[in-house]
From Swiss-Prot:
Any single Gene Ontology cellular-component annotation: fungal-type cell wall
Protein name: Class III hydrophobin F
Gene designation per UniProt: rodF
Top-rank lineage group of the source organism: Eukaryota
Annotated family: Belongs to the fungal hydrophobin family.
Expression induction: Only expressed at moderate levels in planktonic and sporulating conditions.
Keywords from the named record: Cell wall, Disulfide bond, Secreted, Signal
GO molecular function: structural constituent of cell wall
Length: 190
C-alpha cells in the first residue's frame, strides 16, 4: 500500500473512533403474548429534578472553563493585535471546580455552572472532562423525560387497541357430529 493511503485510512479511523455517535435501535419483533384482557398499569411519571438541581447522578459544580481562561488570555492580546481578539475558544472542560448546593441559584457562581458526573466530584483532578453545561444538562433531561412519556403513551395506545380487538371464537364438533360454537355475545364500548 502507498504511505498516503495508510495515512488517510488511519486518520479516518481515528476520527471515527473519537467522535461518539448514538444509534437508534428499532426492534422489529413485537411480543404479542399478552392476554387481550390485560390493560397496562400506569407507570409513575418521571419527575424533573428541581429548577436549580442537576439531573440524577450529576452533581452541580461551579467551574472555570477553558473558554474563560482563553478569553482572559486573548482579550489583552486583542488590544495589541486585533486579529487575536476575534478568536473565540469554546470548551466544556471544567478547570478548578468547586461543589455547589443543588438549591444554590446560578447567580452565586461567578464562573460557569456545570453538572459533573459523580466520579469527578471531590477528585483531585485539575481538569474535569465529564462535565456538562447546566442549561444543556437541564435541556437534555427534559427531552429524555418527554421521549419516555411519548413512548409510554404509544405503548398504552398499542395495548388498548390490542385489547379492543375481539378474540377468535372456537368451534368444535359435538360427540354426535353436530357442530357447536363457544362464542358469547359481549358488549364492547368504543
Amino acid at each position: 500500500m502507498r504511505p498516503i493511503t495508510i495515512l488517510c485510512t488511519l486518520a479516518t479511523l481515528s476520527t471515527t473512533l473519537a467522535v461518539p455517535f448514538s444509534q437508534a435501535s428499532k426492534s422489529t419483533s413485537a411480543s404479542r403474548s399478552t392476554s387481550s384482557s390485560t390493560v397496562p398499569a400506569s407507570l409513575p411519571s418521571p419527575t424533573l429534578s428541581g429548577p436549580n438541581a442537576c439531573p440524577p447522578n450529576k452533581f452541580k459544580q461551579c467551574c472555570t472553563t477553558l473558554s474563560q481562561v482563553g478569553d482572559d488570555l486573548l482579550k489583552p492580546l486583542g488590544a495589541v493585535v486585533p486579529l487575536v481578539g476575534a478568536i473565540q475558544v469554546n470548551s466544556l472542560v471544567g478547570v478548578s471546580c468547586r461543589p455547589m448546593a443543588d438549591a444554590a441559584p446560578e447567580s452565586t457562581c461567578g464562573n460557569a455552572v456545570m453538572c459533573c458526573d459523580s466520579s469527578t466530584v471531590g477528585g483531585d483532578d485539575l481538569m474535569q472532562t465529564s462535565c456538562q453545561d447546566f442549561a444543556l444538562a437541564k435541556k437534555r433531561e427534559r427531552e429524555a423525560i418527554e421521549r419516555q412519556q411519548r413512548r409510554f403513551s404509544e405503548y398504552q395506545r398499542m395495548m388498548l387497541s390490542q385489547s379492543a380487538t375481539p378474540a377468535p371464537t372456537s368451534t368444535g364438533v359435538d360427540v354426535m357430529g353436530s357442530s357447536f360454537s363457544k362464542a358469547k355475545a359481549t358488549p364492547t364500548r368504543v
